[in-house]
UniProtKB/Swiss-Prot annotation:
The keyword Ribonucleoprotein is annotated on this UniProt entry: yes
Location of the region described as Disordered in the Swiss-Prot/TrEMBL record: 1-45
Superkingdom in the source lineage: Bacteria
Taxonomic source organism: Chlamydia trachomatis serovar D (strain ATCC VR-885 / DSM 19411 / UW-3/Cx)
Family: Belongs to the bacterial ribosomal protein bL36 family.
One of the GO biological process terms: translation
S-adenosyl-L-methionine in keyword set: no
Identification of the protein by name: Large ribosomal subunit protein bL36
Keywords: Ribonucleoprotein, Ribosomal protein
InterPro entries associated with the record: Ribosomal_bL36, Ribosomal_bL36_sp
SUPFAM superfamilies according to UniProt: Ribosomal protein L36 (SSF57840)
Pfam families: Ribosomal_L36
Amino acid sequence: MRVSSSIKADPSKGDKLVRRKGRLYVINKKDPNRKQRQAGPARKK
C-alpha cells in the first residue's frame, strides 16, 4: 500500500475513495496494487 500526503483516485481504472477511521483510502478490486492511504498526523504513543 502506497502512503502519501496527497492521494488521487482514477475511477476509470476502478479506484474508489473510502474514508475509514478519519483517513482516506483508495481501494481497487480490479488492480489491488493500486491501494493507497493518505498520510495523516503521526500516531500518539
